[in-house]
């Protein structure tokens, strides 16, 4: 029985390493415009996780396309639009953001993803907050 248990654990670990863990994950972002009176807190989903990848030793001898690595990216997504409260009439109060429906491990597509790692940007409010809850008016 101990051998069966040990084999089950080893099999589980092997499968866990072979599978990628790239899934839609809850994310909270804060949106504000300098002309508007309020900051909006939005709950959305983004793609996050780990993808199996390899780093080749002979990089000098490979073509450039063979050097790209898989990233956790959108398989399917949709855009939602919200209205930032407290904006003057001359300012467009609408803000659109992506919502991850499903994710995949694949090449980064610059048509809809930022494929470089930037410095951490501000993700907090400097103005009074107005939380945005889908389907409810607060």
UniProtKB/Swiss-Prot annotation:
Residues 1-20 form the signal peptide. Gene3D superfamilies: Cystine-knot cytokines (2.10.90.10). Disulfide bonds join 22-72, 36-87, 39-125, 47-103, 51-105, 108-115. Belongs to the glycoprotein hormones subunit beta family. Heterodimer of a common alpha chain and a unique beta chain which confers biological specificity to thyrotropin, lutropin, follitropin and gonadotropin. PANTHER family: GLYCOPROTEIN HORMONE BETA CHAIN, THYROTROPIN SUBUNIT BETA. This is Thyrotropin subunit beta. It comes from Lama glama.
């Amino acid at each position: 029985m101990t051998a069966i248990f040990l084999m089950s654990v080893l099999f589980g670990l092997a499968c866990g390493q072979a599978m990628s863990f790239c899934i839609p994950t809850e994310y909270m972002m804060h949106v504000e415009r300098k002309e508007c009176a309020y900051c909006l807190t939005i709950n959305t989903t983004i793609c996050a996780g780990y993808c199996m990848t390899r780093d080749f030793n002979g990089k000098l001898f490979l073509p450039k396309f063979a050097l790209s690595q898989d990233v956790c990216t959108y398989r399917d997504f949709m855009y939602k639009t919200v209205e930032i409260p407290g904006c003057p009439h001359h300012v467009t109060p609408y803000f659109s953001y992506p919502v991850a429906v499903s994710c995949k491990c694949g090449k980064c597509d610059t048509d809809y993803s930022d494929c470089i790692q930037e410095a951490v940007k501000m993700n907090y409010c400097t103005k009074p907050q107005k939380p945005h809850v889908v389907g409810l008016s607060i």
